[in-house]
Curated annotation (Swiss-Prot):
Gene Ontology process terms (BP): maturation of SSU-rRNA
Role description: One of several proteins that assist in the late maturation steps of the functional core of the 30S ribosomal subunit. Associates with free 30S ribosomal subunits (but not with 30S subunits that are part of 70S ribosomes or polysomes). Required for efficient processing of 16S rRNA. May interact with the 5'-terminal helix region of 16S rRNA.
Record-given protein name: Ribosome-binding factor A
Molecular-function GO terms, alphabetical: ribosomal small subunit binding
Main location: cytoplasm
Length: 134
């Protein structure tokens, strides 16, 4: 049997990504990272995407209550090796502990823009016009 050639993540990648997300969230919630920026910010880890070989974990995070996300992302990336070390006890089943990279999650901003577009008068008028025809 041949492997599928699609670029969609495998079930294993999704499962491991969710486990890594939960482990990173626990490390951040416990306050194990000693950094003023990280300790003063509530950080939401929305998704972790694993590379196909499971050696790189890209964590998409949203710092809440901070206008400049780049400062928090830089602080997280500075402490990525420490966080990686703290993931070990929770991810014992993995042969290699993944390298963790933090990225800003812009999906909430994208959802907000789409919602604003759907609520705009032009789109509302078009949607109402579709209902009149039916």
């Amino acid at each position: 049997m041949t492997r599928p050639t699609s670029s969609a993540p495998s079930q294993r990648m999704l499962r491991i990504g969710e486990q890594v997300r939960a482990a990173i969230t626990q490390v951040l919630q416990r306050g194990e990272v000693r950094d003023d920026v990280i300790e003063a910010t509530v950080i939401s880890v929305s998704e972790v995407r694993m590379s196909p070989d499971l050696k790189i974990a890209t964590a998409y995070v949203t710092p809440l209550g901070v206008s400049d996300h780049s400062i928090v992302i830089e602080a997280l990336n500075r402490h990525a090796r420490f966080i990686r070390g703290r993931l070990g006890p929770q991810l014992r089943q993995m042969k290699y502990m993944p390298e963790v990279r933090f990225r800003d999650d812009t999906s909430f901003d994208n959802y907000k823009k789409i919602d604003e577009l759907l609520r705009s008068p032009e789109v509302s008028r078009d949607l109402d016009g579709d209902n009149d025809e039916q």
